[in-house]
Amino acid sequence: MSRRCQSRRCRPMMEAMTARLLVFCSCWCLAAAGLFADSAAAETVRLAVQKTGTLAWELDVVRAHGLDRQANLQIAVTELASPEAGKIALRGGSADIIVSDWLWVSRERSLGAKLVFSPYSSALGAVMAPATSALETLADLRGKKLAVAGGAIDKSWLILQGAMQQDGIDLKRQANVVYGAPMLLAEKTLQGEMDATLNYWNICAWLEAKGFRRVLGIEDVLPKLGATGRAAMLGYVFDESWAAKHAGVVSRFLDVTRKAKEILATSDAEWLRIARLVTADASALAIYRDRYREGIPRRPIDAEEADARTLFRVLATQGGASLVGNATALEPGTFFRPRSGS
């Protein structure tokens, strides 16, 4: 057979292969174009958070499940050493969202800063004592060494004082109170240097895993102060003018974090996956999981705001101007309410 004949016979095969290649390349280009378009369209939200905070757990869930990509969001995280650093970042414009409390938001609003608060967690601290301790009630703390995390104007401490004063007990005067860093005080209590500690919920979970018991959870005294439920003290905080300009971003971000919370609320396997972040063994991890789940806010904003107004009065009475400034009530507009349709 001549070379010319062979060439004629091969030409259709070559043309078919070329056509297939062109189709493949076209499909690849279209897919890549769509991918790049999605990436280009993704909007960025800047978070400033504590490296060891529980928000880090949720953000890991967001990334692992692609919740940010599904919402067309790019969440840029700056890790900070303290809550105060987050406040500076927000006020300085280097962060869009931080985690703080409505008390601070209300104070900032009274000073002219238009910040808003969206509930993030209702996990509260507790008074913890060794399993062998004779302490049964807070009245038993009179004359005892009580380690209080966070300082003299810590919210849990002020709430506890307000509740106990209704029973004629002044823990600030009747107990030997020591203030300090949460983990340091937990260690001292563990070593027997303190009789009990009022500490943050995650530190309490750590102590619970060490065999300590809860004498009283702060959520247990809220009804005595007029609250109707477990109030969310911590929330996402951002500028309301920024939120108005980026309503879609805010809505999608809050939706993404709600989905992450639901995964952590329903999946024990997810807790095993993030155990490296919690830095807890299996028994301790279960305690962290259960306490975290108890603190997921599920109440309407109206209920949260009403309880915040009630608790503000207690905190203002106990903490004074150093805590709330010259404000006498929760500032209007403190709680974020999305615009309809956003």
Task: Describe every region a protein language model picked out.
Residues F36-A42:
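Boundary at the C-terminal end of the N-terminal hydrophobic targeting segment
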Residues R309-S342:
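Conserved C-terminal helix/tail region of periplasmic/extracytoplasmic solute-binding proteins
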Residues E43-K172, N176-Y179, K188-Q191, D195-W201, ...:
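Short, glycine-/small- and polar/acidic-enriched structural segments
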Residues A243-A321:
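Secondary-structure end/capping motifs
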Residues S121-V127, S133, F212-R213, A232-Y236, ...:
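Small-molecule pocket liners
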Residues L22-G34:
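Bacterial N-terminal signal peptides
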Residues W102-L103, M183-A275:
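Pocket-lining segment of extracytoplasmic ligand-binding domains
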